[in-house]
């Protein structure tokens, strides 16, 4: 299974870490299929760090109305360029907000603290072009 994230800057293809973060991937896919992400904004963009989205209010304080547990023990729990990872307000408080990593150098401290659940495999150049306030949508495809 993979997804296409269409932004104001272009489209990125994402492959999921289903083996390493099965519950997080299932949650993201469910939200995407339900249309939860359609038209939401990247509300937090810090160049050289991350582009974060998934808040239904567009300001970083909202979610889907529930929390999911972190999954931090898999092999792919390293915040490299293009990795998708769950944002949270503390361990096991993630829901819908996620971020896309801009740089390994600035995000190594997030390893095994935030669940990495996928990686951009096409359109990697778009990751660093995303601007705060840009909108996005997610479409999931069966492999």
Regions found by a protein language model. Give the residues of each.
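Cyclophilin-like peptidyl-prolyl cis-trans isomerases
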Residues: 1-143
